[in-house]
């Protein structure tokens, strides 16, 4: 059984017991979270596709950890000006473990 959920502007294909990193959520570690934006639920041959979401479908998860991703390096270079600007960015994420698909 798997489902497709939407969180943080992205879509994820999830199964029970799976761990994944999503955009930062305001839930403390060890807390439970419920995803209501379920776009698709598949249980064997029974496939339910939402328009835009599946009515009554919910995916529950447990927050494992919060953290920051790898650094993305940015370089702005101005030709012939002897000028450049180096910057970096590390995006916050929340690691969740899927506990149930209903």
Curated annotation (Swiss-Prot):
Entry-linked PROSITE patterns: RIBOSOMAL_L21
A Pfam family this chain is assigned to: Ribosomal_L21p
Q: Name one GO biological process term.
A: translation
For the keyword Ribosomal protein, the answer is yes
Record's keyword terms, sorted: Ribonucleoprotein, Ribosomal protein, RNA-binding, rRNA-binding
| Sections of the chain in a coiled coil | none
- Gene Ontology terms: cellular component: cytoplasm; ribonucleoprotein complex; ribosome
- Name any one GO molecular function: rRNA binding
What this protein is reported to do is described as: This protein binds to 23S rRNA in the presence of protein L20.
Q: Which family does it belong to?
A: Belongs to the bacterial ribosomal protein bL21 family.
How is the subunit organization of this protein annotated in UniProt? Part of the 50S ribosomal subunit. Contacts protein L20.
* NCBIfam families in UniProt: L21 (TIGR00061)
Q: What is the protein name for this chain?
A: Large ribosomal subunit protein bL21
Recorded source organism is Marinomonas sp. (strain MWYL1)
